[in-house]
Amino acid sequence: CCMKSDKKAVWGWALYDWANSAFATTVMAGFFPIFFKQYWSHGADVNVSTAQLGFGNSIASFIVALMAPVLGAMADKGSAKKKFLVFFAYLGVLMTAALFLVQKGQWGWAIFIYAMGIIGFSGANVFYDSLLPAIADEEKIDYVSGLGFSVGYLGGGLLFLVNVLMT
């Protein structure tokens, strides 16, 4: 086979996307906006809560846009890709778990913690993506990338379904 590494490395890389996409589908696209509007922004006018959510997403996106070139350069030149991947992934996981502690009406804390979760998620993605050339030869890189993408959609979709069934 043309893999630089064994199948275990390829599947390990792909299965990271399984968990990673679960954050995107369940937290970012699915439930955070609903919980934000109905719980953390309790009592706020719908236009105000929409503006607050938009502001939070914009600030997080702006910070990610500022960080991405620096993190990308670190990923391209550095040898600590896995350490940075783990750091940012843990940041995302811890911030997502911390949302449990945010009380009703505390929209500011919810936005701050959510934004930190997005920074963790996005920062981890930079280093996750940078690992692909290390596990796949150039002629197999599309296949391995597609494997991660498809496994990610499957994982994200399954968790989203489980979460919907829980509500």
Model-derived segments and spans:
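Helix-loop boundary and gating motifs at the non-cytosolic
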Residues: 4-61, 108
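Central cavity-lining transmembrane alpha-helices of secondary-active solute carriers
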Residues: 53-73, 157-160
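C-terminal ends and interior cores of transmembrane alpha-helices
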Residues: 65, 86-106
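Cytoplasmic membrane-interface "Motif A"-like loop-to-helix N-cap segments
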Residues: 75-91
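Short hydrophobic/alpha-helical segments at membrane-entry points of transmembrane helices
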Residues: 106-114
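Cytoplasmic helix-loop-helix junction between adjacent transmembrane helices
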Residues: 113, 119-150
